[in-house]
Each structure stands twice: as structure tokens, then as C-alpha cells.
């Protein structure tokens, strides 16, 4: 059985529930176990990742959160030696090129625009879990994870 840990930081309750349902539908596969850690605004994200991150961990991070933006949380992750190599996917409703480029510049592994359909969220999460972040690096044309998940 393959085991994964997913950390999802978002301040929107509906987005958290939607993502959680998608993860649980994937967890129904007996060959996959997913430990999901929901963080409501990112404030204790570093602490949660530091305490529970393991191999096959990935962070999905919303850009627009109160107090600190997803960009600021990404900078915190990349500057903390305990969690700096944890894969991060910036996960936002925004498809703005500046946000995508800034995410890449700050060290995100991928950027994903939040899909509106449940099926597409499942495909996106599945694609993220299929990546080997130890060897896979996002070439400039493939930084947008949505393109790879279709």
C-alpha cells in the first residue's frame, strides 16, 4: 500500500471541504492511503508540516489567506531547514501569469488553478501524487500542474 501525506492550507471552508471529499474518494482505493492535514489559514502550517511530514508528502497552498499570503508561507517553508524540501503546489483560483511566475521564483514545485469540477480536482490530486518530487522538476512549460493532469 502506498501512503501519502497531503497538507492543504486554505481559509475558505467550502474549498477545504471540496478538497477533503476529493481526497477521501481517492483514499477509497485499497492500494492508497492518504493522510490529509487541513490547515485553515496557514498560520500553523510550518508547525504541522514539521511534526508530521514524511516521505511522499506534498503541500497544496492557497494564495489568498488572511494575515499572510500563500507566497509568504511558501517563503517560510523554503527558508526553514526542517521542511525546505517539502514539495509545494500553489493552489489558487487565479490564473494570473504574475502569480504563476512569482510562485515559480519563490520555489514552488508546481502551480495549479483550482478546478471547478469534483472530477477535475480528483485528477489534479492524483497527478500530484503520481509525481516523484525527488526526481521530477517542473520544466517551464509544465509548471502549471493542470496541463499535466488532463
Language model region names:
Residues 114:
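A Lys-centered signature of the CheY-like receiver
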Residues 20, 36-58:
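Acidic, metal-coordinating helix/loop segments flanking the phosphotransfer/catalytic sites
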Residues 65-66:
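Receiver (REC) domain active-site loop signature in two-component systems and cognate sites
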Amino acid at each position: 500500500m502506498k501512503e501519502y501525506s497531503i497538507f492543504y492550507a486554505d481559509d475558505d471552508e467550502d474549498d477545504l471541504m471540496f478538497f477533503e471529499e476529493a481526497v477521501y474518494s481517492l483514499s477509497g482505493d485499497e492500494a492508497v492511503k492518504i493522510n490529509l492535514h487541513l490547515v485553515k489559514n496557514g498560520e500553523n502550517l510550518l508547525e504541522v508540516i514539521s511534526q508530521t511530514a514524511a516521505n511522499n508528502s506534498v503541500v497544496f497552498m492557497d494564495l489568498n489567506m488572511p494575515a499572510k499570503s500563500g507566497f509568504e508561507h511558501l517563503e517560510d517553508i523554503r527558508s526553514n531547514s526542517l521542511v525546505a524540501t517539502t514539495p509545494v503546489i500553489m493552489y489558487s483560483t487565479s490564473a494570473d501569469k504574475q502569480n504563476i511566475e512569482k510562485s515559480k521564483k519563490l520555489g514552488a514545485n508546481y502551480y495549479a488553478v483550482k478546478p471547478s469540477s469534483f472530477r477535475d480536482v480528483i485528477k489534479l490530486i492524483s497527478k500530484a501524487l503520481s509525481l516523484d518530487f525527488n526526481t521530477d522538476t517542473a520544466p517551464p512549460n509544465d509548471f502549471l500542474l493542470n496541463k499535466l493532469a488532463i
